[in-house]
């Protein structure tokens, strides 16, 4: 099993559901961040309705992230 280096992963302030693998670097997570644009490797990018009317998105697929929390 190989996974991308932590340094090259997109950062995520709030990781939601994650797989439970060992070591921790092997885990993929769903990022709960709402962002202006999904990162390049996101395979399921969903538009989020906001009060401001600005188009914002959330990546809803399990991906490799650099999780802050």
From Swiss-Prot:
The record marks 20-21 as: Reactive bond for trypsin. It comes from the Eukaryota. GO terms for molecular function: serine-type endopeptidase inhibitor activity. Pfam families: Bowman-Birk_leg. Gene3D superfamilies: Cysteine Protease (Bromelain) Inhibitor, subunit H. Serine protease inhibitor. InterPro entries: Bowman-Birk_prot_inh, Prot_inh_BBI. This is Bowman-Birk type proteinase inhibitor A2. Belongs to the Bowman-Birk serine protease inhibitor family. Keywords: Disulfide bond, Protease inhibitor, Serine protease inhibitor. The keyword Disulfide bond applies. SUPFAM superfamilies: Bowman-Birk inhibitor, BBI. One of its GO terms (cellular component) is extracellular region. Expressed in bulb (at protein level). Disulfide bonds join 12-31, 18-29, 38-45, 42-59. The keyword Signal does not apply.
């Amino acid at each position: 099993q190989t996974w991308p280096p932590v340094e090259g992963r997109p950062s995520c302030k709030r990781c939601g559901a994650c797989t439970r693998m060992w070591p921790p670097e092997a885990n993929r997570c769903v990022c709960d961040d709402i962002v202006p644009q999904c990162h390049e490797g996101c395979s399921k990018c969903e538009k989020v309705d906001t009060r401001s009317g600005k188009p914002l998105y959330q990546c809803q697929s399990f991906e490799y992230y650099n999780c802050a929390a």
